[in-house]
């Protein structure tokens, strides 16, 4: 009934099952703006802190490099991206008060004409922006926020597909 080093077989089996488990990633929508793949920085060197879940506490997090950007909406119109509520991901609060299950579900809330495409025909299209955090400090400034039209982005297909990619 005891396995390795006197540990019960059940505990040993559970340990072996979970030792390589990693939680599923629930990243917000990020755009590859220079066609070289989405590049990220880990929490090892430069520490970026950001309030993902809108609890008022900025915590260390992985982040995108400044040549890529987060899709954002300044929901409180204060000129900055304050928390994950203003990104499009699992921390986005939907109109029914529930959190989105992913960034595409969050963005789909803005598909005002229901055609599964987010574009100029949708009421909020002109308000959605891309945040390129040039100084990698997790605090948005006016010069880091770009309109979709400034970047030549005309639409998003809201029919999400799943693809697992190791970003390093």
Language-model-detected regions and their locations in the chain:
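Calcium-binding acidic motifs and repeat modules
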Residues: 3-168
